[in-house]
A protein has these predicted regions:
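Conserved alpha/beta-hydrolase "nucleophile elbow" surrounding the catalytic nucleophile
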Residues: 25-27, 115-117, 166
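Alpha/beta-hydrolase fold nucleophile elbow
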Residues: 107-116
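C-terminal catalytic histidine-bearing segment of alpha/beta-hydrolase fold enzymes
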Residues: 162, 178-220
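Short beta-strand/loop motif that positions the catalytic acidic residue
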Residues: 162-165, 169
Length: 220
């Protein structure tokens, strides 16, 4: 049992464990928010165990949800120092969480897929760039790339990345994904993108289908 981050777990439908998929929820949600995506992903990854942890902090806006980092900005729109520090702290916890899942399951992180939504996408990309062990693929919905860690994980330069975004998102504008692709390309990462027409801040059926098609091609 992983004690670093608590959340939901769903066993592989085949009973044969070869891959790990970890979902990272958005701001103010919890691990149960995304675990239902395992129904779609398990059709192409029948040997995958699915994890969906709660973020480490209770949401600053109240309620029962969690956050990977606080949404605090300076007057110029940049993240304040506390937010940056909390991002780095969450990344450290996630890396420890991944390491513990490796130990618990005997499955190498080279067979791990990280899937994020909104703030979860942002923290997944930060984790990818800081991780010193291989990750197979990243799928990010409705997020962006903050580059707080200011690192480049050379071992993960060939990690497959797909970023999906709604073209009518007024919470995290789709320009955030376009900028993420540009900045990740500059750092040496190749990024696939897909934009869902008429979609606001969410995950559409066509976006989900695109992500499963993307993962199926990888033949993990």
């Amino acid at each position: 049992m992983n004690e670093i981050l608590k959340g939901s777990v769903k066993k592989s439908i085949s009973g044969i464990n070869k891959q790990i998929v970890i979902f990272f929820h958005g701001y103010g949600a919890d691990g149960s928010d995304l675990i239902s995506l395992s129904d779609a992903f398990s059709k192409i990854l029948p040997n995958a165990i699915f994890y969906s942890p709660n973020a480490p902090q209770k949401c600053e806006m109240g309620g029962i949800g969690y956050q990977w980092f606080p949404i605090k900005q300076n007057n110029d729109g940049s993240l304040d120092l506390n937010a940056k520090n909390e991002i780095l702290n969450s990344v450290k916890l996630i890396n420890r969480y991944i390491d513990e899942i490796e130990l618990d399951t005997g499955i190498s992180s080279k067979n791990f897929i990280l899937v994020g939504f909104s703030q979860g996408t942002m923290i997944v990309l930060e984790t990818l760039l800081s991780r010193e062990k291989k990750i197979s693929a990243v799928v990010g919905f409705s997020g962006g790339f903050l580059n707080v860690s200011n690192k480049v994980s050379k071992i993960n330069l060939d990690t497959q990345i797909l970023l999906v975004h709604g073209d009518e998102d007024n919470v995290v504008p789709m320009e955030m994904t376009k900028m993420a692709k540009k900045n990740l390309n500059i750092l040496g990462y190749f990024v696939n993108t897909y934009f869902s027409k008429g979609l606001g801040h969410g995950i559409s059926l066509d976006g989900l289908a695109e992500s499963t098609k993307f993962l199926k091609k990888l033949n993990i």
